[in-house]
């Protein structure tokens, strides 16, 4: 077994298949539908009756969906569907967010509660809060369609829904990226990737949705996506992923270990069984790595905080990425794809209901344990590599095969660089923009009315290495520092950010310069070799 550094694994992943050069709008991927041989491995599932607009009102599906130039459900169709459900069900409340997309589109969402609780009045009972989102990438239509199918099924199966809502309140944001859906492209209207903006918070839309998420404060969060269907491997490029579904829990090691184990040992295991029971296939979410030999290297979902599932998980909740096989095949197998997403979402809900006390208590204890922890924080990690097989499909003859691979596992990753957990951070008033970003992430900072004089831990920059590529407006940097203790005087107005907060792990990944997605890495706090980093730590 060998180790593979996470810092070399940063990848846009299975959903990154995009046009080589971006324009304003309509950045659509080429369509390569499955051959008849491959399609035979993904037949319709008997007895499927999905209760979402693409299936209950097929006449509303645009013709361009079959050509891979549009999704199946326009905004107005989705909005009417949500409003109709809310009018017919007292446990369902329709809302429009008080912010708009980059091009001025609305964000409808539904709040589901059996006790009339809401964002403003969440109630005082012992209940789980579950956040479900889809449509982060606009060219992954089974993501938001599976959310609509879930809502439709809950409206149809009132008895099941009543049992669910005894244990939890649910917020469903079906369409995170309405501009991307309009253009049928992965990106926001500004061509930023919405699923890589969770720490740097470059776009206002990201900040607005993040604040809604923080206000809801979920115990469980799920992010619905699709992955590229036709990615081929092997010497003859005749081997493709066989899975209908790929999924991953949040992997960042700054998430409480008890919460991570709950995700892996309870939720992930149950999800795999539920997918198989539905007649579907699954594997862990992976991306392709650069192998040093002829063997295919697949990398399990990484630990980077800029990605949605890890950013959500760093609020100390159970968080899952759920992906279905769909990018690049337009409307092909859409019922099976949507069913795959629905099965995963229902599995998470049902697992939480069936194991309510264990889930609720483990998460609440994990939050308390993390908040008051004095353990070290993890800044870099690595993945052990081992040989295993992965479910593949031979595209020539349609046979399912167990394909030998090298697998870089993050369940769990192995810490490399750790650092003592600070009691607090001191942030000079001149860096108010940094404080505002941290507040969006759900953190609170106190503005000191007096000057601070005393011992601090300062970080002196010993190395800055820039990436070779331009990424979303910046050239990212890998920063190394040396920690030194010294006396410091900081003026009144300096911010004190205590780390005795539930969301403190988001401060760690943002403020510690060595972390791959830190504010220093993204140039929000620019540094050079020899500089003193302008954020200070208290022991």
Curated annotation (Swiss-Prot):
Signal sequence coordinates: 1-21
Principal EC category: hydrolase
Domain of life of the source: Eukaryota
Domain Peptidase M14: 71-352
InterPro entries in the record: Peptidase_M14
UniProt KW Transferase keyword: no
Assigned GO CC terms: extracellular region
Cofactor(s) annotated in UniProt: Zn(2+)
Record bears the keyword Protease: yes
UniProt subcellular location: Secreted
Family: Belongs to the peptidase M14 family.
Function: Extracellular metalloprotease that contributes to pathogenicity.
Entry protein name: Carboxypeptidase 2
Upper lineage: Eukaryota, Fungi, Dikarya, Ascomycota, Pezizomycotina
Gene that specifies this protein: MCPB
């Amino acid at each position: 077994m060998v180790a593979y550094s996470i810092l070399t694994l940063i990848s846009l992943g299975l959903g990154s298949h995009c046009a080589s050069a971006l324009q304003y709008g309509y950045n659509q991927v080429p369509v390569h539908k499955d051959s008849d041989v491959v399609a035979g491995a993904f037949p319709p599932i008997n007895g499927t009756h999905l209760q979402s607009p693409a299936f209950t009102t097929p006449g509303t599906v645009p013709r361009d969906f079959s050509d891979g130039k549009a999704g199946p459900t326009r905004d107005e169709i989705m909005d009417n569907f949500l409003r109709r459900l809310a009018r017919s069900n007292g446990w369902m409340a329709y809302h429009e967010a008080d912010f708009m997309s980059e091009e001025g589109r609305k964000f409808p969402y539904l709040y589901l509660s059996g006790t009339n609780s809401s964002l403003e009045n969440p109630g005082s009972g012992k209940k789980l809060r579950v956040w479900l989102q889809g449509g982060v990438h606009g060219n992954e239509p089974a993501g938001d369609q599976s959310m609509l199918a879930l809502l439709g099924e809950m409206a149809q199966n009132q008895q099941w829904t009543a049992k669910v809502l005894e244990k939890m309140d649910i917020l469903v944001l079906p369409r995170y990226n309405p501009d991307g859906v309009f253009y049928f492209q992965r990106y926001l209207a500004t061509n930023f990737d919405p699923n890589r903006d969770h720490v740097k918070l470059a776009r206002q839309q990201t900040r607005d949705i993040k604040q809604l998420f923080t206000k809801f404060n979920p115990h469980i969060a799920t992010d619905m996506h699709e992955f590229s269907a036709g990615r081929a491997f092997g010497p003859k490029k005749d081997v493709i992923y066989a899975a209908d579904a790929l999924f991953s829990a949040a992997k960042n090691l700054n998430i409480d270990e008890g919460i991570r184990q709950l995700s892996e040992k309870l939720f992930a295991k149950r999800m795999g069984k539920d997918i198989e029971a539905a007649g579907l296939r699954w594997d862990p979410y992976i991306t392709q790595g650069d192998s040093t030999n002829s063997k295919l290297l697949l990398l399990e979902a990484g630990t980077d905080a800029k990605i949605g599932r890890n950013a959500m998980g760093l609020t100390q909740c159970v968080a899952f990425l759920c992906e279905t096989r769909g990018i690049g095949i337009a409307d092909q197998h859409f019922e099976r794809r949507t069913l795959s997403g629905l099965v995963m979402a229902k599995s998470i809900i049902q697992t939480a209901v069936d194991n309510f006390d264990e889930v609720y208590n483990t998460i609440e204890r994990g939050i308390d344990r993390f908040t008051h922890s004095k353990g070290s924080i993890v800044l870099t990690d690595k993945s052990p590599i081992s040989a295993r097989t992965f479910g593949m499909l031979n595209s020539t003859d349609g046979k399912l095969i167990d394909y030998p691979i090298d697998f870089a596992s993050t369940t769990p990753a192995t810490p490399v660089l750790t650092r003592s957990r600070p009691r607090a951070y001191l942030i000079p008033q001149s860096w108010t923009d940094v404080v505002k970003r941290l507040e969006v992430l759900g953190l609170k900072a106190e503005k000191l009315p007096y000057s601070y004089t005393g011992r601090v831990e300062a970080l002196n920059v010993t190395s800055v290495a820039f990436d070779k590529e331009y990424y979303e407006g910046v050239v990212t940097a890998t920063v190394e520092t040396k920690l030194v203790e010294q006396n410091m005087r900081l003026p009144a107005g300096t911010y004190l950010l205590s780390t005795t907060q539930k969301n403190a792990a988001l401060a760690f990944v943002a403020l510690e310069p060595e972390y791959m997605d830190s504010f220093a890495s993204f140039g929000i706090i620019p540094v050079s070799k020899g500089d003193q980093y302008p954020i200070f730590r208290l022991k």
